[in-house]
Every structure is written in C-alpha cells, then in structure tokens.
Amino acid sequence: MSKINKLEHIRNIGICAHIDAGKTTTTERILYYTGKSHKIGEVHEGGATMDWMEQEQERGITITSAATTCRWQDKIINIIDTPGHVDFTIEVERSLRVLDGAVAVFDGVAGVEPQSETVWRQADKYNVPRMCFVNKMDRMGADFYRCVEMLKDRLGAKPLVIQLPVGIEENFKGIIDLIKMKAVIWKDEALGAEYFEEDIPADMKDKAEEYRAKLLDMVVELDDHVMEKYLSGEEVTAEEIKRLIRKGTISAAFYPVLCGSAFKNKGVQPLLDAVVDFLPSPIDIGIVKGMEVSTGEEKDFPISVTEPFAALAFKIMNDPFVGSLTFIRIYSGKIISGTTVINTVKNKREKIGRMLLMHANNREDIKEASAGDIVALAGLKDTTTGDTLSDIDQQVILERMEFPEPVIELAVEPKSTADQEKMGLALSRLAAEDPSFRVSTDYETGQTVIKGMGELHLEILIDRMRREFKVEANIGAPQVAYRETITKVCEIDYTHKKQSGGAGQFARVKIIFEPLKEVKDLKDEDKNKIFVFESKIVGGAVPKEYIPGVEKGLNNIRETGVIAGYPMIDFKATLVDGAFHDVDSSVLAFEIAAKAAFREGMPKGNPKLLEPIMQVEVITPDEYMGDIIGDLNSRRGQIQSMDPRGNAQVVTANVPLAEMFGYVNTLRSLSQGRAQFSMIFSHYDQVPSQVADIIKAKK
C-alpha cells in the first residue's frame, strides 16, 4: 500500500462514555473480532485486555487510555480506550485532542448520564466527529428509543438512527439495519462470531419503515441530486445512503446511532463496519493548527506523509519492561528509528530509539511510522504531555492542550527515610505522566502536597506509588485547593538594592497587576490561562535578558498568595518600566525585585479568596426531593435545575467542594440508599467573607 493511500485506510478513534456504560467491554469485543485478542476479557472478572493496570482490574474502571492498533476489512484502526470516571476527564480530554473520530457508548438503561455530557462537550470543543452505540440492550429496563430522545434533550445532538433493536431485554437477539432494510441476528452459542441476515420480523415492519423514512429525510438534505431522486420517488441506493451518512458524520450534521450488547457479543461487527464506513480518516480532517517557529505565524498544516515531520506527544506511561513510553500522534511526514528530532516547545533535541506499536499491554517493535499513526517512543528525555516533536529544519509547534487546575490536595510524607528519596522519584514520574496531578512543598510545614482532580484520582496515584515504586507513605486528610485573586488594578514601583560591600545587586521594576477579566485587549491564547505576563518595556529601561527573571520571579511567588498563602490566579502582570545598573544588575536581582513587588503590590489589589465550585447532579425518587434540596441549600448550594427523568427527579446544583466531603453517606441516609450523585468541577468563585475568615484563621 503506498504511503499516500495508507492515510485513507487509517481510523484514529476513541471509545468514550460514562463509567459503567460498557466501554471497555465494547473495546474488548472489537479486539476479539479483529483478531487481536485470543480470549474475551471480562471487566467484572478483572481480566480485560485494555484495563491493564492492577488497580483498573480490581476496581473495574478504566484509568489510563491505552492505545491499541487493530485491523478490520482493509483498514487500520487505532483505538484509544478512555476512562469514564469523572476524576479522569483529563485522560479523555487529551485522547480527544489526537483523535479523528469517536464512538460514544451509552448505557441502554441509564441513557445519557452526567459524565457522558462532560465527554460530549469535550468532543464538541475539539470538533470530533462521532457516532453513538447504545449498549446493554439485553438488560432489564433497556430502552433504545428513550436513549435516542435523551441524546436530543440532554446533549442537543441530532441523532441519525441507522439501526433498531430486535427483541428487548433478555430477548434481545439482533438489530435491523435501516440502510439494507434487513434484520441481523446473532447465534448465542458462537460467542457472537456467527450472525446471519433475514427479513425484518413482521411485527417490526412499520417501525422500520418509519425510521427508514426519517433517516432518508435527514441524509438527502446533504446532496441536491439525491434529494431530487428521492422526491421523485426513485429508490436511493445503499451506497448513496452510506456516502451521505459519512459526509454528515464528518461535518457533524448528525450522529449515527447504533445499538447492541457488547457483553452478549451482539452488534459489534456492524459497529466496526460503521467505524470504517462513516468515521473520518486523517485525510478527511485535512489540517492541523500550529505555529511556524521561524516566523511565529499561526498556520494550518496539511496532514500528509510528504510534509516535514510533526507529531504531538499526548501521553506518557511507565511500562514495567520498557521504562518511560511517550505516545505520539504523527500529523505529517515520517519518522525512522535512530533519527533525531526536536522538541520545539522545550527547544531540546530527542533521539528516536525504540518505536513501538501497542496492543493494550503487548508491544510490537517497528522501525518506521508516518502521518496518521499513533505509536509509542521509548527513552525520550525531555518530552512531556502536550509537547510537539518536529523536523529540525522546518520547526513547528502544534496547538497545545489545556489542563485544568487541580481542586483537591493531600499532604503525604514518607514512612521512613528509605522511602524519602523513592517518594520524590515516584511523584515526579507520576506528575510527568499526568498533567492534572501536581506536586509541591508547603513552605511553612515543609510537607509534600499532592493535588489532583478528585479523591479517587489521588487515591489511585497513591496506590500506584505503593505498587509500582514500593513507597510507603502516611496520607493526610483531603483538603480543598483554595486559590486567591485580585479584584482591582494596582501598580507598584519597587527597587531592590544591595550595594554594601562585595558583589552588589540592583533592580528596579514598575509592574501593573490587574484582574484578567478586566483586561481589555487579552489575546486569544491567553484567555484560558491563570497568569499572564507581558513586558511593555521600551528604550531598554530593562535589558531584554533580564525580563525572563521578572516573569520567573512572579511565577514562583504567585504560588504563595498574600491572604492565606494559596496560589494566586486569574491576574495579569505588565512590566511597564524599570532601571538597571551596569555592574550590579542580574537576572537574579530582577527575580528578587519582582517577588518583592508582588508581596508589596498585591494587597493593594483588594485580594479575595476563591474556592472550587462543583456541579453536582443528584438523581432521586420523588419522595426524597425536599430533604435533598434542603440539604444542598445548607451546604451553600445553588440549585440550577430540577427535571423529571423516568420515575425519578434530577437535581443539578452548584456547591462548594468544601461542603461536599462525606456527602455520599448523607445522601444514602436521606434517601435510604436510593439516590445517587455525581460531581464535576465547574469553576472557581469568591468565598463569602465569614467563611474566608475561618479559612484564614486555620492557616
């Protein structure tokens, strides 16, 4: 197969969903039917091929997105298995960044759940074409048609139903293919490997005709010629329908909806056919956004094998046999083992050693990879998640990923001095793998503090520290990751002088600090940042080489705010003037001056304490609504909406994280164990003054 042609044959897809919708089982079945997995792994027995970390097998949830390559028909499918638990949305976000298409798996009983909405919104952000697989059609209470309605109501999506279920709950035995207008039935005894086509059952003829008409109405809109044909009563061919479904899926005009039961081995092969037929190849995506290093210009780069090499590192993993593995998505050009490329974000050269194609936890050595491929590189020194690897002669930086601020923190200390050094190494390794996990030192207590996206996130990282790095540690109680900010513009002129004997130090800085939301001319790339620095020095008042010292000083000192020592966020610092001394000035002197200017200037900016606000969704039977709403109000919650769902009520509220510790037990007793809840980070907001006083007193 020629290299150019090969791009058309690649499908880079993610399989994403809410926890427990059956995502890992679906991936397992795909690997089984594409011949990559010799036995079917069951998640609830702790044996799935994709869930290869020990904790994943015990908990039955997927944590790291393992990348797997398999083949179907004559196509190469690279699958990224993404986690569905809300604490791991960072994993979903970074895998979506490098995918061309996705399969969203929904639970046929529960329908669209909170995490499904989060993942859907993330996929919208990266414009990922996707299709929907309504799974668990064999379960008690499964309702395909309700699921389709929920796709419209809760996601605002335009579903295009291309299959209907045959039989319900335990009698589910196959699907109706609305393109071919045939029923596809699976033989139970053949592990789903054998299935056959037959005529649509008589009792489903009318429903199939109704949904076929809806399908045609939607797809013919995309092509005037086919629409004329359809309106004049001519038959639209299966090939024409497929071509238009592909066109509409790639342009996100609609989302094809399929159904099945991965666990019962029904519906997986047609799902694979649909991945190949309807989801885009890298050629359909066409371009990737980035910046040309030599000119600093933003550009669209074509996805092509003949262009210079450019790839994005989207995941780092520690492999027990190979060591550190960096997963990259190649957007253009090709890469050969043994060559040298440049990390354009860090401006460091990297030698390409071993290159691997991954199959869950097995690996295959390869010598060459090209545009469209997702491969793992062993032994890179300086590359972290979100970095670009590029051709040395034509350097580009691809669009970077954004990572959310952590909302929860824990103090950890090693149990023995032997653990001390190992813990430092373990934490830095884990932080390199996961950009939403941060490690810092509390300056006052000297304790090591780890920060993450939720209790489960930190629990699993501590568990990995014990298992993989053999580090025993004492763990403190979870703490809320408060932040600080300023609410008004302030200016400070500060001179740092130390000129009494010996080498002197001199630096003067004049800095304007302002809340980000009040900055009028904020650049697009700065809109999602928590701290922006700009130099407006003219005429050499501060030489160019000293300005990075000012930025570094501010970046370091903002980790310790002026109210209660929490990191300062959402502000801009502009260096507008300054002075230097020919002999006594240095980068360090300007760093010290910037820190002192921050300490002196920030109190003038009317600083406020911020706390993480969580979006909480509670699903409860009617009779407990009053008590649950009363309890959420008592937790400083603000009710956003109340909607019926089936025979239950769904309450959505914004509640400070500080008030949500231990909520699971309260909810259980309020509802006799019948209500359930989920929460995701929403935003930071000001802490009411009486609560802020208590927090300050504790510090």
UniProtKB/Swiss-Prot annotation:
Pfam families: EF-G_D2, EFG_C, EFG_III, EFG_IV, GTP_EFTU. GO terms for molecular function: GTP binding; GTPase activity; translation elongation factor activity. InterPro entries: EF-G-like_DII, EFG_II, EFG_III, EFG_III/V, EFG_IV, EFG_V, EFG_V-like, G_TR_CS. GO terms for cellular component: cytoplasm. SUPFAM superfamilies: EF-G C-terminal domain-like, P-loop containing nucleoside triphosphate hydrolases, Ribosomal protein S5 domain 2-like, Translation proteins. Keywords: Cytoplasm, Elongation factor, GTP-binding, Nucleotide-binding, Protein biosynthesis. SMART domains: EFG_C, EFG_IV. GTP binds at residues 17-24, 81-85, 135-138. It is found in: Cytoplasm. Residues 8-283 form the tr-type G domain. Its main location: cytoplasm. It comes from the Bacteria. GO terms for biological process: ribosome disassembly. Belongs to the TRAFAC class translation factor GTPase superfamily. Classic translation factor GTPase family. EF-G/EF-2 subfamily. NCBIfam families: EF-G, PRK12740.1-5, small_GTP. Catalyzes the GTP-dependent ribosomal translocation step during translation elongation. During this step, the ribosome changes from the pre-translocational (PRE) to the post-translocational (POST) state as the newly formed A-site-bound peptidyl-tRNA and P-site-bound deacylated tRNA move to the P and E sites, respectively. Catalyzes the coordinated movement of the two tRNA molecules, the mRNA and conformational changes in the ribosome. PANTHER family: RIBOSOME-RELEASING FACTOR 2, MITOCHONDRIAL, TRANSLATION ELONGATION FACTOR G-RELATED. This is Elongation factor G. It comes from Rickettsia africae (strain ESF-5). The gene is fusA.
